[in-house]
A protein has these predicted regions:
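Glycine-rich beta-strand-turn "strand-cap" elements at beta-sheet edges
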Residues: 1-2, 11, 36-49, 73-101
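Hydrophobic core residues within well-ordered beta-strands of beta-rich domains
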Residues: 4-6
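Short coil/turn motifs at secondary-structure junctions
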Residues: 13-15, 43, 55-57
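Short acidic, gly/pro-rich beta-turn/loop elements at beta-sheet edges
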Residues: 18-20, 60-62, 99
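An amphipathic, aromatic/His-enriched active-site/gating alpha helix that lines ligand/cofactor pockets
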Residues: 26-37, 53-89
Length: 101
């Protein structure tokens, strides 16, 4: 079971979505996430989210503290939101709903 989930919402600059996906694919190839799931999903209207499902808080922090972070690779292809931020992110520990059965 996952221990931590992270979601990073973003909007590629016009005409830059394919370049962003290529940069992400090259990053994932060259800097493997090991067995931690990371995928980009299409939210609609030109907005996407990078979802990371981590086994533990420690594995999440290891990704966050990488010297070469995926967000820095993606930033050049991303249109900032109205608040000036390139990404809108949230994360938290998994609530195991089976504990309530």
């Amino acid at each position: 079971m996952a221990g931590m989930i992270n979601c990073m919402r973003f909007r590629p600059k016009e005409g830059q979505a394919e370049a962003l996906f290529k940069a992400f694919a090259e990053y994932a190839r060259d800097n493997p996430f090991d067995d931690i799931m990371h995928h980009i999903i299409n939210l609609s209207d030109g907005e996407y989210a990078l979802i990371g499902v981590h086994h533990s808080v420690e594995s999440f922090m290891a990704i966050v503290n990488r010297e070469n972070r995926v967000s820095e690779i993606m930033r050049e292809y991303v249109e900032p939101y109205e608040d000036g931020e390139a990404f809108h992110s949230f994360s938290g520990p998994v609530v195991n709903h089976n504990d309530y059965l």
